[in-house]
Regions:
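Nucleotide/phosphate-binding catalytic cleft detector across ATP-hydrolyzing
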Residues: 1-159, 176-191, 203, 211-310
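Short, acidic (Asp/Glu-rich) active-site segment that either coordinates a divalent metal cofactor
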Residues: 167-173, 181-182
Length: 310
């Protein structure tokens, strides 16, 4: 077995993210082998198709096996992409919102680590045996921003991590999180997409998929009717304005300091957050893998004796 491989995983409500991949959190279980091996995880004698749709809301992601199975799929994807051995020792780096970090750290680490024994499974028809030798947990959002040191020169800056279900807020003072400023708002992109879907259904009688709506938000031309596209962007603009108002109401003055927006929602809302002239100074980090990259970077710093995050 080779040296320990560090793999960062961002366990989102809507999507799982690693340094090189992002895939939906949907998980469909089958008793028998599906017709295709694409995105199929075989574990414990059962088959799971990974990435079909999204998970129902789980406020505690450790209450079911779903996110553990999604973690195995994420590890397999990274090992294959990196050309690493499929029998590997893993240092898993993950994150939690700062608002619940102290409360949930122990249970999350136990959930991912288990007993540290070898885990045999198959992914997309290939055999894997991984041993999770260590789990390190870090504050999400903060870990992502640390990858962008040039953005941290301001004495105070707001960080808004727009996820699927929540928007996690914090203020950094001289690069250090101000714990009293941390908030978690249930205003994530799932709500935005659902509101858009309902408005399109009401005006046009159409049931659009999440994939269609997200494609339009990214600016894809496609073959969509321009009237529908206009409604999508109008609703997204309303959502962005409401989000900025909620940030201000939570005690973070977006008129007084820069605001860094990151996460999957920031990538989708880039044009709308950038268009809020006079409301804030937005800095958009649209790389959805920034948290995962930040986790791996922090593990590297730990190994050199800089900081800690267990």
């Amino acid at each position: 077995m080779n040296d320990v491989i560090v793999i960062g995983v961002d366990h989102g409500y809507a999507a799982m993210k690693t340094v090189h991949f992002s895939f939906p959190t949907g998980l469909v279980e089958y008793e028998h082998e599906p017709y295709t091996q694409k995105d199929v995880l075989e574990y414990g004698g059962r088959y799971y198709v990974v990435g079909s749709g999204r998970q129902p809301l789980q406020r505690d992601k450790t209450q079911t096996e779903d996110y553990y199975l999604l973690t195995l799929a994420a590890i397999a994807k990274e090992l294959e992409h990196r050309g690493a051995e499929h029998t590997a020792s893993i240092h898993l780096a993950a994150g939690l919102p700062l608002t619940s970090f102290g409360r949930d750290k122990k249970s999350c680490r136990s959930y991912l680590y288990r007993d540290g024994s070898a885990i045999p499974f198959r992914y997309e028809g290939q055999d894997y045996t991984v041993t999770i030798q260590e789990v390190s947990l870090f504050p999400q959002g903060y870990a992502a921003v640390l990858t962008q040191t040039e953005l941290l020169d301001e004495p105070s800056v707001i960080v808004a991590d727009i996820g699927g279900w929540t928007v996690d807020l914090m203020r950094l003072d001289n690069r250090i999180p101000n714990a009293a400023s941390c908030r978690s708002l249930e205003l994530g992109m799932i709500r935005c997409v659902d509101e858009i879907s309902e408005q399109v259904r009401r005006l046009f009688g159409l049931s659009m998929t999440t994939a269609q709506i997200e494609s339009a938000l990214r600016g894809s031309s496609g073959g969509m009717d321009e009237r529908i596209r206009a409604v999508i962007h109008t609703q997204a603009g309303k959502y962005a304005r409401n989000l900025l108002s909620a940030v201000t109401e939570s005690g973070l003055d977006i008129r007084a300091m820069p605001a860094i927006f990151l996460g999957g929602g920031a990538a989708l809302l880039k044009r709308h957050l950038s268009a809020t002239d006079g409301l804030c100074r937005p800095l958009i980090l649209d790389d959805v893998s920034l948290n995962a990259k930040g986790y791996e970077r922090l593990v590297g710093q730990m190994s050199r004796g800089v900081g800690n995050g267990r």
